[in-house]
Amino acid sequence: MEEEGGGRSCGTTRELQKLKQQAMEYYRENDVPRRLEELLNSTFYLQPADVYGHLANCFSKLAKPPTICKIVGKDVLDGLGLPTLQVDIFCTIQNFPKNVCSVVISTHFEVHENALPELAKAEEAERASAVSTAVQWVNSTITHELQGMAPSDQAEVDHLLRIFFASKVQEDKGRKELEKSLEYSTVPTPLPPVPPPPPPPPPTKKKGQKPGRKDTITEKPIAPAEPVEPVLSGSMAIGAVSLAVAKACAMLLNKPLYLNIALLKHNQEQPTTLSMPLLMVSLVSCGKSSSGKLNLMKEVICIPHPELTTKQGVEMLMEMQKHINKIIEMPSPPKAETKKGHDGSKRGQQQITGKMSHLGCLTINCDSIEQPLLLIQEICANLGLELGTNLHLAINCAGHELMDYNKGKYEVIMGTYKNAAEMVDLYVDLINKYPSIIALIDPFRKEDSEQWDSIYHALGSRCYIIAGTASKSISKLLEQGNISIPKSNGLIIKHTNQTTMSDLVEITNLIDSKKHITVFGSTEGESSDDSLVDLAVGLGVRFIKLGGLSRGERVTKYNRLLTIEEELVQNGTLGFKEEHTFFYFNEEAEKAAEALEAAAAREPLVPTFPTQGVEESAETGASSG
């Protein structure tokens, strides 16, 4: 019995020795004894008040870097109560999974206030499907693809996201081709062709035309509307995950997101200063959705002088907004004059009424082009401000919303139609009369390229001609490498759909290289996420366009701007914007620039990010950034 007990004791001792040996090897491999000795020695000399807090901080620096362990997509509501996508990033930090950050991306869908019920219902279903597909992508393939990656490896993350998206594009292409082939197999025998319609009757004599006078002017037919650039359902998952990873990296490094984006922009070299983007604040809206006759001005936008800080600009525009509210609340004075103006409207004073729009500004009823501009002039005079000195104006014309395709003309004011050539004259006259207007956004449809050229050459030396809706998606711009169609000297870019952080860096570099200005814009249906402000600051864009100073989802972003400006002031890294400069190229300069571009195109280019060239083998026609 004693021998048996001694054998068990000997076996236990051998097992303990073996465990001790394994422990020694484990700690030695991880350099624990040396590091622990150094840490304890240094702690003794420092003698911190919180000894365990000090040890915890030191050990955390020795821990493995965080890696992505899970990405979760959720269906949430935006500022208008419509579905959109939220992405949560979970990382393994010191052996435990932790929720690091969340982002909400806005959808690309426009807000149609007066849309037909059937169209609104169809878009609602399309939006719901897009968000549902995005959630599915995030929670299945994307979370597995990025598992174990470091959030700091933004370029590689974006590379994998683009590969994934390219595969989805190919899947969608194959599905559509299959559906097409099935349709062809069931199509009945076509009917004989319908004869062409008879030629239109000669134009009737215009009112006021003298007898015997022949009207020899024949208007050129308008170019048909181009097909809307398709958006692959679910594509917002790519942009949302890319942003979420960038934000997670910033939070893990205890840095603001804008600084992380600035490092991406400057090849990981921290810039000495960062400038705040100039504000483009929507003050009033007089577009198609307003109750007045004026359609031309979807947004009348105020731009504070570049020398003003963001805080000073916001305070000034808040005072202007208060004055507009007072004017709307004032009772209507009795009409003493009933003569008619040039546009057929009564010249007597009309009470201005308004309602809050989804853009965060007041939609007011105006019957002439001058009315909202005179209103702003009056407010500036009351506040001791001078247009063209303290602030400038921009007009979002939303040309694509003004076209009446039955008449082939733009309906500038209800019942007043102008062809594309007449619109050029209208804008030139407007800028001549109101030189404080320094930017026109989407003055035409994108199809009216001839008029874009005309207005650029007529006004480009004193006014920014900016393409927003008229521009192509970021994906297409990067694919083609051409931002000059339509002719403009500025672009509005937005973070939507499959646009990654690497894409934003690349497109802003491209815009900068062409001496164009970049406007970072919000979408029509925004969420309360304020990340796009950090993107604008980090990318160093010229302007930021967030809508008006009302509605929580927009005010949140203005508050973030103020916070960032305060941080930069405290850090001594706030740079300042230069005066407005209009880079205008005449035809000779344009030809010289095109020759240089052609020469540069013959040289092999090294991609800045590995996301470039991923989709060369895939059809990108189903994409939109």
Swiss-Prot record:
Q: In which residues is substrate bound?
A: 300, 548
InterPro entries for this protein: DD_ENO4, Enolase, Enolase-like_C_sf, Enolase-like_N, Enolase_C, Enolase_N
The record's annotation in Pfam families points to:
Enolase_C (PF00113)
UniProt record, GO biological process: glycolytic process
State any single GO MF term. phosphopyruvate hydratase activity
Catalytic activity, EC: 4.2.1.11
Instruction: Tell me the CDD domains matching this sequence.
Output: DD_ENO4
Q: How is it modified after translation?
A: Synthesized as an approximately 70-kDa precursor, which then undergoes proteolytic cleavage to an approximately 60-kDa enzyme; HOATZ associates directly or indirectly with ENO4 to mediate this process before its transport to mature flagella.
Record keywords, A-Z: Glycolysis, Lyase
Bias (Basic and acidic residues) occurs at 336-346
Coiled-coil ranges per UniProt: none
Is Lyase there in the keyword field? Answer: yes
Any one GO cellular component localisation term in the record: phosphopyruvate hydratase complex
Lyase keyword on record: yes
Annotated region described as Disordered, given as residue ranges: 184-226, 331-350, 604-625
- Give the family per the record: Belongs to the enolase family.
Q: What is this protein called?
A: Enolase 4
| Organism annotation | Homo sapiens
- Supply the source organism's classification: Eukaryota, Metazoa, Chordata, Craniata, Vertebrata
